[in-house]
Swiss-Prot record:
This is Polynucleotide 5'-hydroxyl-kinase NOL9. Polynucleotide kinase that can phosphorylate the 5'-hydroxyl groups of single-stranded and double-stranded RNA and DNA substrates. Involved in rRNA processing and its kinase activity is required for the processing of the 32S precursor into 5.8S and 28S rRNAs, more specifically for the generation of the major 5.8S(S) form. Required for the efficient pre-rRNA processing of internal transcribed spacer 2 (ITS2). Associates with LAS1L to form an ITS2 pre-rRNA endonuclease-kinase complex and is responsible for the transport of this complex into the nucleolus. Interacts with PELP1, WDR18 and SENP3. Interacts with LAS1L to form an ITS2 pre-rRNA endonuclease-kinase complex. The modification Phosphoserine is found at residues 128, 502. It catalyses: a 5'-end dephospho-2'-deoxyribonucleoside-DNA + ATP = a 5'-end 5'-phospho-2'-deoxyribonucleoside-DNA + ADP + H(+); a 5'-end dephospho-ribonucleoside-RNA + ATP = a 5'-end 5'-phospho-ribonucleoside-RNA + ADP + H(+). Its EC number is 2.7.1.78. The keyword Glycosyltransferase does not apply. Disulfide bonds: none annotated. It comes from Mus musculus (Mouse).
Length: 714
């Protein structure tokens, strides 16, 4: 009996788990780590932690009522000790003050976000964005979202934003509760936009009064269940917004063309689909990573703060310069939006011919901006105060005419609002000298020079550098003191000291230079810049032509179905700006072309037959643009399609044709008529030198053949 008990006794150094481990084969065909029973893996641990944080953010106390899987939280701590704990953001010592200009600037830089304070003075815990920003589907193409203070929602797509409670910031513009909804365009052709929750002062109300106010503000938009959900999960000092699917004639018009419809669609399919993605998809938007949004550097934030402060006290002239695709237009939009937060309007002088902001390309324009800019240039086409059609995308070999046009447009500036001047991205060789001429002619108070690590070296445009550098048509300070030289008289004319002091030539008074390091991300490079710029110019033309569409209740009609205006030959003069065309071929150049509708001083009443041809390029006001869709030689009339009203069209007496062409998608998309499409043909001779079967952009990958390195013979 004693022997049997001894036989069943286990050795003290061997356990059942050790015997099982010894009995397993030593050859393992999988590299996956061995898992102990009762311990979660990293993926399960991360999923459990996300669920606990989500439950805590939605108001549930998971410590008191343990959810499913919480019994292994203690064991999870043993696995989490091997990884370093995440650093908590610094807690400010004082509660946030009401939003100011500097606070608005910091929202554009994700590195400057601070932890907001709750009503009890304790910091609000910041977790992943998809946890602290609850989203609820309201139906009928509407979504409700709540943003804690200091957090942002970066998205792609187009939508209409309404601030129901709190304050929001988009592209530098502050949207307060009670303001009209704003249309926001966050398309993938540019950096994505971010809707930020702006910290505001804690209201002197009780919790019950705040909940009652939120319910009253949400009543016109939501149902009772939705209001209860908002009150239950409302973050302290948060903001409530409603996102709606956008319906406008501009959007519907762009969707009818293949060359522009893809701009409004999502770029690619998502990797993972969740409930938030399904909810936001109903209104046509999607959450994006914060790193894809607009981010300003510290120097950019300081420059914006200084410019906003000086613009509130006066009307400074601000000139922006920099290389191509460095972020001048983006900086201009942010500056304009921030200025509109405190002043009623901002004047804008467009000197960039290739990439205009508010007009079709090829124009020098002056206009007053009174509404925020919440999208790319082709989404906010405006009517200028004065505009001249230059007709080309650059001013190579025609600098004098370009400077004369800029001075002609600049004379209409009344100094009622701050003026922002946008310049071209040509800052090398003659482009730099032309920029020096513009600084002397326009005499800005501030020059904002954007630079980047990827751009070539550009001299710093200080006031001393501009004074000592010769332009194309203006001289440096040293040469100006030697006397004046007029091209018409050469060196045979001399002036006295009094005549020099009273000379109408521009006198440079100096400026303050603000150097801004650009951190904007751009998808353009030397190979695809021409392709991108052409697409943006076509979108600007389509944005202007969308004004031809009737209001929303009416059906959308193609352009070729609209009734054009009939303009007699004897009523307007014609001029081709970018080339010398024989008089016998002038009507071929005008037909099916993009024309500027201008007004010149000369009277056209003495001409009876026509067409009337101008001998030189005029500097005159351009009232708008149109398409010459046909010429009737029997009735001797032009058929013009334009959104200009008839009362303005009566004052037009000149048609200017430039190098800006009509987008090809307009000719290709002509539904309805059967047979051959007008102005589109496939009958051409490929044997002509220079002809090719492939129509489109040059393939740069095959443009530069790679030669193999051959070893030399010994």
């Amino acid at each position: 009996m004693a022997e049997s008990e001894v036989l069943h006794r286990r050795a003290p150094s061997r356990s059942s788990w050790l015997r099982v481990r010894k009995a397993r084969p030593h050859l393992l065909l999988s590299r996956r780590g061995r898992r102990r029973f009762g311990v979660l893996t990293r993926v399960e641990l991360r999923r459990l932690r996300r669920r606990l944080l989500r439950a805590h953010a939605l108001g549930g106390d998971w410590k008191q009522v343990a959810p499913a899987g919480a019994h292994v939280a203690v064991k999870c701590k043993l696995r989490a000790r091997s990884r370093p704990a995440p650093r908590s953001p610094p807690t400010p010592s004082v509660p946030p003050a009401p939003c100011t200009a500097s606070a608005t600037c910091s929202l554009l830089n994700p590195r400057n976000h601070s932890t907001p304070q709750s009503r009890a003075g304790r910091p609000v815990r910041k977790v992943s964005p998809n946890v602290t920003q609850p989203v609820r589907d309201l139906g009928s193409g509407r979504v409700l979202m709540m943003l804690p203070p200091g957090e942002g929602f970066t998205f792609s797509g187009i939508c209409r934003v309404t601030c129901v409670y709190g304050q929001l910031e988009v592209y530098g513009h502050i949207i307060n509760q009670g303001q009209p909804p704003q249309d926001v365009f966050s398309v993938y052709t540019h950096s994505y936009l971010t809707i930020n929750g702006v910290p505001y002062a804690e209201p002197e109300k009780s919790e019950k009064a705040i909940r009652r106010e939120i319910r009253a503000l949400l009543k016109p938009y939501t149902k009772l269940d939705d209001r209860n959900w908002v009150v239950r999960y409302f973050p302290p000092l948060g903001s409530i917004m409603i996102l709606e699917r956008m319906q406008s004639r501009f959007v519907d018009f762009l969707k009818t063309y293949k060359c522009s419809s893809y701009v409004l669609l999502q770029e690619n399919a998502p990797v993972r689909v969740n409930s938030e993605f399904t909810t936001l998809k109903k209104i046509g938007i999607r959450r994006q990573k914060r790193k894809k949004a607009i981010c300003l550097s510290e120097s950019g934030l300081c420059a914006l703060e200084e410019l906003v402060s000086v613009s509130c006290d006066g009307c400074p002239v601000i000139l922006l310069c920099g290389a191509c695709d460095i972020g001048k237009s983006t900086f201009n939009r942010i500056l304009i939006n921030q200025l509109l937060n405190s002043i009623p309007g901002v004047d804008y002088l467009e000197c960039d011919l290739g990439q205009t902001e508010f007009t079709p390309p090829g124009c020098v324009a002056l206009l007053t901006i009174t509404e925020p800019l919440l999208g790319p240039p082709y989404t906010h086409q405006r009517k200028p105060q004065r505009m001249v059609y230059y007709g080309k995308m650059n001013c190579y070999n025609d600098y004098e005419n370009y400077i004369d046009i800029v001075k002609y447009v600049f004379r209409d500036y009344k100094r009622e609002f701050p003026l922002i001047i946008n310049t071209m991205g040509w800052v090398s060789d003659n482009g730099l000298r032309l920029l020096v001429d513009l600084i002397r002619v326009l005499s800005p108070n501030y020059v904002v020079q954007l630079y980047s690590d990827r751009c070539k070296f550009t001299p710093t445009l200080t006031s001393e550098y501009v004074e000592l550098t010769d332009g194309l048509y203006t001289k440096s300070k040293i040469k100006r003191y030697r006397g004046f030289e007029i091209p018409e008289f050469g060196d045979n004319l001399e002036f006295t000291y009094e005549e020099k002091e009273s000379s109408p030539l521009p006198v440079f008074t100096g400026h303050v230079l603000l150097s801004v390091h650009s951190e904007f991300l751009s998808s353009k490079n030397e190979k695809n810049r021409a392709k991108y710029n052409r697409i943006f110019r076509d979108l600007a033309v389509l944005g202007y032509l969308s004004q031809l569409m009737l209001p929303v209740p009416e059906s959308l009609s193609p352009l070729h179905s609209l009734t054009p205006y009939q303009v007699p030959f004897s009523a307007v003069a014609i001029r081709v700006l970018h080339a010398d065309v024989a008089p016998t071929h002038i009507l071929y150049a005008v037909n099916a072309s993009w024309v500027g509708l201008c007004r010149i001083v000369d009277d056209m009443k003495g001409y009876t037959r026509g067409p009337i041809l101008l001998a030189q390029n005029p500097i005159c006001d351009c009232l708008g643009f149109g398409i010459c869709r046909g010429i009737d030689m029997d009735k001797r009339t032009y058929h013009i399609l334009t959104p200009l009203p008839p009362e303005e069209l009566k004052t037009v007496n000149c048609l200017l044709v430039g190098s800006i062409s009509i987008p090809h998608c307009i000719f290709q998309n002509q539904p309805g008529p059967e047979g051959s499409v007008p102005y589109v043909t496939t009958d051409y001779n490929l044997n002509i030198p220079g002809a090719t079967e492939k129509i489109g952009e040059r393939e740069y990958g095959k443009a530069f053949p790679r030669h193999k390195l051959r070893q030399r013979r010994k």
